[in-house]
Amino acid sequence: MATVSRKKKKVKVTPEGVVHIKASFNNIMVTITDVQGNTVSWSSAGKNGFRGSKKNTPYASQVTSEGAAKEAYDLGMRHVDVFIKGPGAGRDAAIRALQGAGLEVRSIKDITPLPHNGCRPPKRRRV
């Protein structure tokens, strides 16, 4: 029995928005929301086909940001404020990709959480 495919509901959004970039040591996630915090588009390195150690590369973050930004641009978003969280590689590449996709970056803010000597950190890597 064939299922009826429904068309995805496309909603026009306001021209202003917020980009949340979470760059961990293992992955990068980009979420674009409107000013109220409702998600407009999102993307991650794993969603774009990167696996394993390739997920935390500047190229992966560039592809991830471009995908989310193009989707938001098509829905009508033009100006964004950027919030970056995490120590991962490719933080700068993600912002450059947002600008390359046509979104005007108005402000960049680093909201990486810093402990006031909380939990003991993981042991040092020996590479």
From Swiss-Prot:
InterPro entries assigned: Ribosomal_uS11 (IPR001971), Ribosomal_uS11_bac-type (IPR019981), Ribosomal_uS11_CS (IPR018102), Ribosomal_uS11_sf (IPR036967)
GO-annotated cellular components: ribonucleoprotein complex; ribosome
One Pfam family from the record: Ribosomal_S11
Signal sequence segment: none
GO molecular function: rRNA binding; structural constituent of ribosome
BP terms from Gene Ontology: translation
UniProt KW keywords: Ribonucleoprotein, Ribosomal protein, RNA-binding, rRNA-binding
Lineage: superkingdom: Bacteria
Gene3D superfamilies: Ribosomal protein S11
PANTHER family tied to this protein: 40S RIBOSOMAL PROTEIN S14/30S RIBOSOMAL PROTEIN S11
Role played: Located on the platform of the 30S subunit, it bridges several disparate RNA helices of the 16S rRNA. Forms part of the Shine-Dalgarno cleft in the 70S ribosome.
Similarity field: Belongs to the universal ribosomal protein uS11 family.
HAMAP family found in the cross-reference section: Ribosomal_uS11 (MF_01310)
Subunit structure: Part of the 30S ribosomal subunit. Interacts with proteins S7 and S18. Binds to IF-3.
UniProt protein name: Small ribosomal subunit protein uS11
Species annotation: Chlorobium luteolum (strain DSM 273 / BCRC 81028 / 2530)
Gene: rpsK
